[in-house]
Amino acid sequence: MSSDSEMAIFGEAAPFLRKSEKERIEAQNKPFDAKTSVFVVDPKESYVKAIVQSREGGKVTAKTEAGATVTVKEDQVFSMNPPKYDKIEDMAMMTHLHEPAVLYNLKERYAAWMIYTYSGLFCVTVNPYKWLPVYNPEVVTAYRGKKRQEAPPHIFSISDNAYQFMLTDRENQSILITGESGAGKTVNTKRVIQYFATIAVTGEKKKEEPASGKMQGTLEDQIISANPLLEAFGNAKTVRNDNSSRFGKFIRIHFGATGKLASADIETYLLEKSRVTFQLKAERSYHIFYQILSNKKPELIEMLLITTNPYDFAFVSQGEITVPSIDDQEELMATDSAVDILGFTADEKVAIYKLTGAVMHYGNMKFKQKQREEQAEPDGTEVADKAAYLTSLNSADLLKSLCYPRVKVGNEFVTKGQTVQQVYNAVGALAKAIYEKMFLWMVTRINQQLDTKQPRQYFIGVLDIAGFEIFDFNSLEQLCINFTNEKLQQFFNHHMFVLEQEEYKKEGIEWEFIDFGMDLAACIELIEKPMGIFSILEEECMFPKATDTSFKNKLYEQHLGKSNNFQKPKPAKGKPEAHFSLVHYAGTVDYNIAGWLDKNKDPLNETVVGLYQKSAMKTLAFLFSGAQTAEAEGGGGKKGGKKKGSSFQTVSALFRENLNKLMTNLRSTHPHFVRCIIPNETKTPGAMEHELVLHQLRCNGVLEGIRICRKGFPSRILYADFKQRYKVLNASAIPEGQFIDSKKASEKLLGSIEIDHTQYKFGHTKVFFKAGLLGTLEEMRDEKLAQLITRTQAICRGFLMRVEFRKMMERRESIFCIQYNIRAFMNVKHWPWMKLYFKIKPLLKSAETEKEMANMKEEFEKTKEELAKTEAKRKELEEKMVTLMQEKNDLQLQVQAEADALADAEERCDQLIKTKIQLEAKIKEVTERAEDEEEINAELTAKKRKLEDECSELKKDIDDLELTLAKVEKEKHATENKVKNLTEEMAGLDETIAKLTKEKKALQEAHQQTLDDLQMEEDKVNTLTKAKTKLEQQVDDLEGSLEQEKKLCMDLERAKRKLEGDLKLAQESTMDTENDKQQLNEKLKKKEFEMSNLQGKIEDEQALAIQLQKKIKELQARIEELEEEIEAERASRAKAEKQRSDLSRELEEISERLEEAGGATSAQIEMNKKREAEFQKMRRDLEESTLQHEATAAALRKKHADSVAELGEQIDSLQRVKQKLEKEKSELKMEINDLASNMETVSKAKANFEKMCRTLEDQLSEIKTKEEEQQRLINELSAQKARLHTESGEFSRQLDEKDAMVSQLSRGKQAFTQQIEELKRQLEEETKAKSTLAHALQSARHDCDLLREQYEEEQEAKAELQRGMSKANSEVAQWRTKYETDAIQRTEELEEAKKKLAQRLQDAEEHVEAVNSKCASLEKTKQRLQNEVEDLMIDVERSNAACIALDKKQRNFDKVLAEWKQKYEETQAELEASQKESRSLSTELFKVKNAYEESLDHLETLKRENKNLQQEISDLTEQIAEGGKHIHELEKVKKQLDHEKSELQTSLEEAEASLEHEEGKILRIQLELNQVKSEIDRKIAEKDEELDQLKRNHLRVVESMQSTLDAEIRSRNDALRIKKKMEGDLNEMEIQLNHANRQAAEALRNLRNTQGILKDTQLHLDDAIRGQDDLKEQLAMVERRANLMQAEVEELRASLERTERGRKMAEQELLDASERVQLLHTQNTSLINTKKKLETDISQIQGEMEDIVQEARNAEEKAKKAITDAAMMAEELKKEQDTSAHLERMKKNMEQTVKDLQLRLDEAEQLALKGGKKQIQKLEARVRELESEVESEQKHNVEAVKGLRKHERRVKELTYQTEEDRKNILRLQDLVDKLQTKVKAYKRQAEEAEEQSNVNLAKFRKLQHELEEAKERADIAESQVNKLRVKSREVHTKVISEE
C-alpha cells in the first residue's frame, strides 16, 4: 500500500492516512547529520530540536531551532532519527526509541492530520478537534480484509484485524480503548461498532410482536442505537469535553460461526452519579435533562410538569446549560427513536421520562427549620406533589418519610428527627440512587433486547474506560479508575511480551523469558490483597464508630514503611491535603480519604425506599425491589432471607467484583489496544502541548511499553532489506557475480563491520538489533555515502566540462559556416533571377493547397456515401442481433438449469454424509451423558440418606437446647440488674467473634490450599488428556483433509453457480437495455416533433421581436429629433430673452439719461413724461406677453416630457419582453443541444451494440459446441435419473405440495409487490406535488424580492428628483440674487444698447415667428407620436396575448413530460419487480430440484439410518427424562429447606420483637443494646456473606470443571464423571448446609417465649460455633474429595485405553470414507474442467455486458437530465412571466403618480399666473425674477457670459456718446410704436396657444381615464395572485402536516 495508486481506494481520506510518494522521497533526500541532530531538554517545551555544536566534560552545547544556544548534560541529549523515519507509522520501528522521538513523531503526524499511529501493539490516536473524512463508507470497504501492514494505521484496521483473527483463530477478541476525558474514546468506540455493524450485518430484522407495537429495527440498528441512549443518560459536558462519558463500558458483540452478527451486550462501570446533584461552573449535568427542557417534544413538558427554563431547576443549573457543539433538540429525537428501536415498551418509556423529571423536581424541594427546634419541616408542598405524582407516591407520605424517617431500634420502629441539612442530603442521595438504578436497569433492558437467541460462537469486546487520572484532589473514584488502569497495564505488559518473546522463540533467538506483568504486582497487591487498602476500607465500614482518621491510622499501621509503593505525602502549598500516596506505573498519586467511608457505604433513607417499593409505577418498584430495608427484615422474612448478605455489599466490593469479571473476560480474549490522546487543553485543531501529551503517554503506558521494548530487540529488518540498504558499508564482503543467500550475506556484512557483535541476533527470517545499534549503522552508512557521492560528483563534473568543451568547439565551426553562407547570400540578393525566384516560390504552394482542397471534397463525398451504407447495414445487423440474443438466452437458460441440477445433487450428497457423521457423534455423547446421569442419581440417593441421619442428630441437639431455655426462663427476673455486666460480656464476645473470624479465614486459606491441590491433580489429568489428544490428532487431520476436499468441491460448485447466475443476470440486463433503447428512440422522436413545433413558435416570436425592435428604433430616432428641436428652441428662446433684457436695460438707461439731460425745458420734461409713460406701458405689455409665452412653453415642455417618459417606459417594457423571449429562445436552444447530444450517445450505443452483436455471434457458436457437450452430460444424467426414478414416488408427492406452496407464496408476493408499487407511486406523486409547491413558494419569494428591489429603486429615483428640485430652487435663488445685484449696474449699458435696439427688436420678431412655427411642428409631431404610441400599445397587447398562448403551450408540454416520466417510472418499477420475481422463482426452482435430486440419491440410506437413530434417541431421551425428574425432585427438596429456613428466621425476629417490647421502659439501655445487636447482626450477615462466598468459590470450581468436562466430551473421553462427582459433592455440601440452617431455624422457633437478654448473645455464640463446625466438616469433605480425585485418575487411564480402541474403529471408518472421497474426486475433476471452460466464456460475456449496461445507464442519465432541464425551463418561463406582469403593474402605478404630480404642477403654475395679474404694480421685480428663471435654464451657456462682459465694456464707451443719443429719441418713439403692434401680435399668439393647451388637456384627461381603468385591471389581477398564493400556502401546510 505504498504507492499513490494503491492509496486511491481510500478516496479523499488518502492524504489523512499516509504520506504521498513525493513526500516520502523528499524526506529521504533531506540533508541530515546523525551526529549533530539531537533533541535536548527544554523547561518550556519539554524537548526541542537542536544542532550539537560542541561536547566537553559531560556537557553538550547545542543550538535550538529557535536560535537559542543551550548547554545541557549528556543524559539530557537524545539522538534524532534519520529523515526516513519522519512521520513513521509504527514508532516501534524507529532507530532511536525514546520520549522526544515518540513525541515529535506524533506531533508531525498530527500536523499533517494523520491522527492514528502504531506503537508496537498500541494504536495511538490524537483528537483532531475537527471533522476529517477518514470514516467514510469507502474507507470501511478499503480496510476490509486488509492485514495490519498492508494499510495505514486506523481504528478500522484494528477492528478488521480483530474480526479476521476471530474468524481464523476461532478465538474471542477484545479492543481496549483508554484515555483521558475528551481524548476521543467514545468516538472511536462508535467507529468500532459502526465498522462491525457494516461488515458483519445479518440482514435479518427481528420479529416484531404485534401486540407490543414496538418500532424495532435490525440488530445492527439496535447496536448502533444503544449509543445515543447511553450517551443521553451517561454523558455530560465537562471542562475538557463537551460529550464526556461519565461511565466505563464493555460492549460485547457476538458473532455466529460464519462471522455474522448474532447479538450484543453491554456492561457498565463507575457511573458518576454525584453529577446528578452537583456540577462545576464550566460543566453541566447529563444531556437528557437539557434535551427534555429543549421543548422539542412539548408533550414531555406537560407530562413532567416542568418548564423549558433550566434555571428553574436547582439540580441542573449549577453550571452551563447549553453546549455550542450539541443540538439538544436533535439529540432528544435521536434518544427518543433509540428508545423505540431498542424495544422499550410505552410504559417503560414513560417511566424513564417521569423518573428523570422527578429527579429535577427533587432538586427544587424546600425545607425549613421549625421554630425553637432543630427539626426540619417542608417549606411548601407544591414541588413535592409534582415529584410524588411522577413517582406514583403519596406526597404526604414522601415528606413524612423524609422529615421523620423510621429507624429500627431493637425490635421496634422509632421515628427519628432530621435537621434541614440531613433532609437535603437524603433527597440528594435518593435522586442519585433513582438515576443510577434507572441507568443500570436501562443497560439490562438493552442487553435483553440485543440478545437475539441466535446461535453465537465468538465475541469481540470493546472496552471504553477512563484512563489514568492524576488530579490535585484525588478521591475514591480516582483510586478505582487508577486501579483498573493498573490491572489493564499489567494485562498489556504480560500479553505484549508473551507475543514478543514468542517471536524470539519462533525466530530461534536465545532468550530468557521475563514476565513483565510482575512489574506492577506490588502496587496491585497493595490495593487488593487481604489486608490491602480496599480490605481495610470494607472492614472500617462495618464498625459503627469508625472514622476517616481511624481508617488512615490503620492504613499507616499496615503499610507505611512496609511497602515501597505506599508513601506518606509531603504537604504542598496551595494544594488540598493528601493522606497517603501510591506509586503507580504512571506516576505517584496523592489521595485524600475524606468521606471514603460514607461513599463506600452509600446509605439511603430506608423509609423512602420502602415507599418506592410500594409505588404504583412498576418500573420504580422494580428498581428498588432488591433493596433490603429494616421494615422488610422485621416483617417479611421470606423475602429477606435470600439477600441478607448482599444487602450490605459495599461500593468497593461491588467494583472489585465487576473488575474481576472484566479481567476474566479479557484474559479469555485476544486483546488489541487503542490509546487516545488530548493534544491541547484549548480544543484547538492542529496544536499540541508537549508536557500534556507526555503526561498522557506515561499514563496510557505507551512510554512504559517503549521501556520494556528496549530491553529486548526492538529493531528488526528482513535479511533482503538489510543486505540492500547496508551493503554499501562493505561491498567487498559480499562477492559479486555469484548467488549468495541473504542471511549469509547479512552475517558476512555484520561480521566485517566494527560494531559490538553482542548487540544483534540472527533469526530465521530477520536480523534483530538492540535499541540504538541501527542508528549507529545509519551513521556509518551516511558517512560512506558521503564519500562515494563526493567521488562520483568529481567524476561527473569532469565529464560534463569535457562535453561542454566539445559543444563549444562544434559551435565555433557552425558560426564560421553560417557567416560564409550569409556573405554569399548578400552577394546574390540583388540578382534579378533571385528576385524572380522569391516571387514564384509562394505561388507554387497556393496551387498545391487548391489541389488538396479538391481532393478533400471528393473524399468527403465518398465518406458520406459510405456512412449511408453503414447505417443501412447497422439496422439490418440490429434486427439480426435481437433474434440471436433471444436464441442465445434460451440456450443458456437450458444449460444453466441442467448444470445447477447436477451441482446441487452432488452438494446434497456431501451434506448428508456430514450429517450422518454428526448424528453418530451426538448419539455417543448422549449415551455417555445418560450413563453419567444414572451414576449421579445413585450418589444423590446415598447423600440423601446421610442427610436424614444428620437431621435426626440435630433434633437431639434441639431437645438439649430446649432444656437450657427452661433454665434461662427461671433466671429472667435477675437480668434487669445484670444489664451492665452483660454489655461488658458482649464486648468480650466481640473479641471472641473476631478470633473466630480469624480462625475462619485460616480455614478458608486451608480450603484454598486444598483447591490448589485439586487444581494440580486436574493439571495431571490434563497432561494425560494431551497424550490422548495427540493420538486423536492424526484422526482429526485425516478427517480435516477429507473436509477440505469436500469444501473445495462445494466452493467450486458455488462459484460455478454464481457465475452462471451472473451470466443470466447479464443476459436479462441486455434485454432491458434493448427495451430502454427502443423507448428512448420513441421519446426522442416525440421530442424532435415537439422541438420542431417549438422552433416554429420561436421563429414567429423572433419575427415579432424584430418588428418591435424596428418600431423601437424608429421611436428612438424620432425622440432624438424632438430633443434636438427642443434644444434649438431653448437656445433661440434664450437668445430672444437676452435681447429683450438688453433692450429693457437700454430703455431704462435712456430714460434715466433723458431725466438727467431733459431738465432744460418744460416741453422736454412733458415729452419725457409721456415717453416714459408709454415706455412703462410697453414694458408691462412686453412682460405680460413674455409671461404668457413662458407659461405656454413650460406647459408644452412638461407635456412633451410626459409623452417622452411614457414612450420610454413602453420601450423599456418592450425591451424586457424582448429579453424574455431571447432567454426562452436560448433555453430552447440548450434543450435542442442536449437532445442532439443524447442522439449522439444513442448512436454510439448503437455502434457498441453492433460490436457486441458480432462478439455474441462468435460466442454463440462456441456456446453451441459447449451445449453439445452439456447435452451429452445431460443424457448421462437422465440415464441416472431414470434408474432412480422408481424410488421417487413419495418425494414427487412432496414436491407437488411444495410447488403448491410456492405458487401460493408467489401469488401473495405478487399482491404485496402490487401494493408496494402503488404505495411507491403515491409517494412519488406526493413528492412531486411537494416539489412543485416548493418551486411555487420559491418563485413567490423571488417576486417579492423583485418588488422590494423595484420599490427601493423608485424611492431612490424619487429622492434624486427631490434633490434635483432642491438644487434647481437653490440655483434659481442664486440667479435671482445675482440679477438683483447686477440690475443696479446695468444703467450704463442702456446707452450702448440704444444703437442696436432696432436691430435686435427685428431679430426678436423673426425669432418669435420661428418659435411659433416650431410650436406648430411640435404639435404635429406630438399628434403623430401619440398615434404611434397607441399602435405600440396594440402591439404590446398582441405580444402579451402571444406570451399567454406560449405559457399555455409550455404548460401542456410540461404535462406531457410529466406523463411520460410517470410512465417511464412505472415501467421501470414493473421491470424491477419482474426481475426480482424471476430471480426468486429461479432460486426456489433450484432448491426444489436440489431436494428432489438429493432424495433420489440417498432415500434408502436415510431410511435405515433414521430408524436406528430414532430408536437410540428415544432410549436416551427416556434416560434423560428420568434423570431430569430425579434432579427436579432434589431441587424441590432444596427449595423446601430454604423455605423452612426463612420461617425459622421470621420466628427468630418475632422473638426479638417481644423481647424488645418488654425492655421499652429503659430507652437508654435499649439503644446501647440495639447498637450491640446491630453489630452482631452485621457479623452474622458477614458470616452469611462468607458462606455465600464459599458457595461462589465452589460454583467457580464447578464452572471450571464444567468447561474441562465439555472439552473432554468433545474429544470422546470419560472425564465427564469427574465433574459430575464434584457436582454431587457440592450438592451434598449445600444440602448439609441447608439442613444446618433448618435446624438452627427450628431451634430459634422454640425460643419465641424467651424474654431475656442472654438469649440474643447465646444464639449468636451458637451460630458462630456452628459456623466453625460447618467449616471443619467442609474441610473434611474437601479432603475426602481429594482422595476421590486420586481414584478417578485411575479411571481416566482406563478410559484412555477405551479411546485407543475407538481410534482404531475410527481409522476403519476413515478408510471407507476415503474410498467415497476417491469416487467423488473423479466426478469433481470432470466437473472442474467443464466449469473452467464455462468460466472463461462467462468472463468474456460479462465484460461485454458491463460495457453495454454502462452505456445504457449513461443514455438514461442524459434523458433524465433533459427532462429535468425542460422542467427547469418551464419554471423559469413562469417566473419571467410573473416578473413581467409585476413590472407592468409597477409601471402603471408610476405613470399614475407622474400624472398626479403633473396636475399639481399645472395648478401651481395657474395660481402663479393669477397672482402675477394681481401684482401689476410690482412688475419690475417680477421681471427680474422671471429673468433669473430664464437664466437658470441656460446656466451652461458660456456665450451669454462673454456677451455680458462685452456689453459692460460697450456701456463704458457709450458714456461718451450721450449727445448722439438725444438725437435718436425721435427714432426711438417710432420703434416703440412698432413694438406695441408686435405685442398685440404676441397676445394673439398666446391666445392660440391657450386654445391648443385646452385641447391637449382634454386629451390628457382621456389618457388619465384609460390609465385608471388599467389600474383597476391590475388591482383585480393582483387580488387573484394573492388568492393563488394563499391557496399555495394552504396546500404547502397540508403537505407538511401529512409528512
Curated annotation (Swiss-Prot):
Coiled coil: 843-1939
Matching Pfam families: Myosin_head, Myosin_N, Myosin_tail_1
Main location: cytoplasm
Keyword Metal-binding: no
Keyword Metal-binding assigned: no
Protein family per UniProt: Belongs to the TRAFAC class myosin-kinesin ATPase superfamily. Myosin family.
Name by which UniProt lists this protein: Myosin-4
